Amino acid sequence: VVLGPASDGRNAAANNKASDLIRQICCGYGDCGFVPNVCV
């Protein structure tokens, strides 16, 4: 993760990408106790 105001957009994009991947894995395999409501 890159820190600083100039990198906020990149961090948001990376976080969104990670969230999408987590959501796919969790919703596909149903093994996501560490991420509440990930499939909502």
From Swiss-Prot:
CC annotations in GO: extracellular region; host cell postsynaptic membrane
Record's subcellular location: Secreted
Tissue specificity statement from the Swiss-Prot or TrEMBL entry: Expressed by the venom duct.
Propeptide residue span(s): 1-23
Protein keywords: Acetylcholine receptor inhibiting toxin, Amidation, Disulfide bond, Ion channel impairing toxin, Neurotoxin, Postsynaptic neurotoxin, Pyrrolidone carboxylic acid, Secreted, Toxin
Alphabetical list of InterPro entries matching this protein: Conotoxin_a-typ
Domain of life: Eukaryota
Residue positions where Pyrrolidone carboxylic acid is found in the record: 24
Disulfide-linked positions: 26-32, 27-39
Keyword Iron-sulfur (UniProt): no
Primary location recorded for the protein, binned into one broad class: secreted
GO molecular function list: acetylcholine receptor inhibitor activity; ion channel regulator activity; toxin activity
Biological role stated in the UniProt entry: Alpha-conotoxins act on postsynaptic membranes, they bind to the nicotinic acetylcholine receptors (nAChR) and thus inhibit them.
Domain-related comment: The cysteine framework is I (CC-C-C). Alpha4/6 pattern.
Family membership: Belongs to the conotoxin A superfamily.
Protein name, per record: Alpha-conotoxin-like Lp1.6b
